[in-house]
């Protein structure tokens, strides 16, 4: 039966239903109205649908769908809709963007992606962010000329930062806004690189790296025991008794500091106070004026190798192979008056020292297998944690957690306030010499020649990084983009996880 025949039959059926002399759409007696029964109406609609073309069925479907499903974004104010969307994760938001043009427009709102970015706890370079906002506020070009202009070229901010077209979206007036969706995507790729071990590795000591022509050295040829860096400089200490100051981006050695008569085993710096502090196997601690490249003070007191040193706003804290840690006043008028406390109690070498200004507590790690916490004001021992089965070689303390590494081949995470063991990580095949952590990850280095990346919250090992000479790893530091580590073979290695990514804002 063709569609025309279907149509004739339906018309006949409707005519029969409505030709009854007693039929009235307003009849108070339901039984006298054939269409008052829902089943009859359903049958009629089925017959009507069967008589329609495909296009007609689609039109009816769309109408019925609109009756069954209500788009909440058309009912609620836009601010409420955005609040609802803010509870979704990245994958769900991307799926929602495919639902309709209206949802796509709403979900390109930068506020949602900014909230997601912040919920992740991801780093934002506040200086660059403020520079962008300062530049944005001073430009009031009309749309579309300004928008088209920005889409075609990079922009230099007031302090020299280059901003790229993909970093912007535009409001209804054509003014640029920061594209938080783009920033989220770039940082998500960066996190994925960390989890899956995607990186580029290079070295500060690579012969392909050019050094300034007026320098008679290229890099240290002896073991490098310690490194520390920020956005501008890196400082390293080595067996050749020197402290090297590098430009962290060009990888040029800017200068060397001479003063120790033994290997430089540890160092720390405070840019706010323009202070660099180093500890040595000659048992001394030197405070350097690194801009004038000379020692300011030399502290004597330890009777063996100085293995750890921390500088804060008011104190220097050091640890030594002589079984003690010491607290030194930075504002002392003479080195003889500088020693504030000698922290005694460990039964073996104190290999690492940490300090948190938030809690006022010092944490020491020793070859006697214990961690100890101390009050910096009184010098009293607050807690002893029997942490490992063998000596502890390294530790970090952030005010809430202590993470330690040992020759028992484990990394352990402790709650600092109670000493409770939270998690134990296994994977290294030799002594764990250095460990660092943040809220998301732990990075460790050991005598097995590896650097390992772990999930702080689950203990899962993400990846293992090797150096070309399989050399012992002595020290490391990391940020959100890279790891820098030093080794027994004199190499300073850099693993970059941000290759090909736009990290302008983080």
From Swiss-Prot:
Stretches assigned to the F-box domain: 70-116
A GO-annotated cellular component: cytosol
Superkingdom of this protein's organism: Eukaryota
The keyword Mitochondrion belongs to this UniProt entry's keyword annotation: no
Main location: cytoplasm
GO molecular function: ubiquitin-like ligase-substrate adaptor activity
Alphabetized UniProt keyword annotations: Cytoplasm, Meiosis, Repeat, WD repeat
Protein name according to UniProt: F-box/WD repeat-containing protein pof11
Any Pfam family the entry gives: F-box-like
GO biological process, one term: SCF-dependent proteasomal ubiquitin-dependent protein catabolic process
């Amino acid at each position: 039966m063709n569609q025309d025949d279907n149509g004739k039959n339906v018309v006949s059926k409707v005519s029969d239903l409505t030709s009854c002399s007693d039929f009235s759409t307003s009849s108070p007696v339901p039984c006298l109205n054939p269409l008052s029964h829902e089943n009859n109406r359903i049958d009629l609609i089925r017959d009507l649908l069967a008589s329609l073309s495909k296009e007609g069925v689609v039109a009816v479907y769309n109408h019925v769908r609109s009756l069954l499903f209500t788009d909440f974004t058309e009912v609620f104010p836009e601010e409420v809709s955005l609040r609802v969307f803010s509870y979704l994760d990245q994958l769900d938001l991307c799926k929602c963007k495919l639902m309709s043009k209206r949802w796509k427009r709403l979900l390109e709102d930068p506020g949602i992606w900014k909230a997601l970015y912040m919920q992740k706890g991801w780093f934002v370079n506040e200086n660059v962010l403020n520079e962008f906002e300062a530049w944005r506020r001073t430009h009031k070009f009309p749309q579309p000329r300004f928008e088209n202009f920005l889409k075609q070229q990079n922009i230099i901010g007031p302090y020299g930062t280059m901003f790229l077209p993909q970093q912007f979206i535009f409001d209804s007036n054509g003014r640029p806004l920061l594209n938080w969706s783009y920033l989220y995507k770039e940082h998500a790729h960066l996190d994925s690189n960390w989890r899956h071990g995607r990186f580029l590795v290079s070295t500060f000591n690579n012969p392909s790296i050019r050094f300034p022509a007026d320098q008679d050295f290229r890099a240290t040829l002896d073991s490098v025991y310690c490194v520390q860096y920020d956005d501008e400089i890196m400082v390293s200490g080595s067996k050749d008794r020197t402290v090297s100051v590098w430009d962290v981006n060009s990888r040029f050695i800017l200068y060397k500091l001479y003063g120790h008569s033994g290997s430089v085993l540890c160092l720390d710096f405070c840019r706010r106070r323009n202070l660099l502090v180093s500890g040595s196997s000659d048992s001394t601690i030197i405070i350097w004026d690194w801009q004038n490249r000379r020692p300011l003070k030399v502290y004597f007191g330890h009777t063996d190798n100085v293995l750890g040193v921390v500088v804060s706003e008011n104190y220097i804290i050091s640890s030594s192979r002589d079984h003690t840690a010491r607290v030194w006043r930075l504002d002392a008028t003479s080195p003889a008056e500088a020693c504030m406390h000698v922290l005694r109690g460990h039964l073996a070498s104190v290999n690492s020292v940490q300090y948190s200004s938030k809690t006022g507590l010092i944490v020491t790690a020793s070859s006697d297998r214990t961690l100890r916490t101390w009050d910096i004001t009184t010098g009293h021992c607050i807690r002893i944690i029997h942490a490992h089965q063998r000596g502890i070689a390294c530790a970090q303390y952030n005010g809430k957690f202590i993470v330690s590494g040992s020759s028992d081949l484990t990394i352990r995470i402790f709650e600092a306030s109670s000493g409770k063991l939270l998690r134990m990580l296994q994977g290294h095949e030799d002594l764990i010499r250095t460990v660092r952590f943040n809220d998301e990850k732990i990075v460790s280095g050991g005598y097995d020649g590896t650097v390992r990346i772990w999930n702080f919250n689950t203990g899962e090992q993400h990846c293992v990084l090797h150096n070309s000479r399989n050399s012992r790893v002595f020290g490391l530091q990391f940020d959100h983009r890279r790891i820098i580590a030093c080794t027994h073979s004199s190499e300073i290695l850099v693993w970059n996880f941000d290759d090909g990514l736009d990290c302008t804002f983080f």
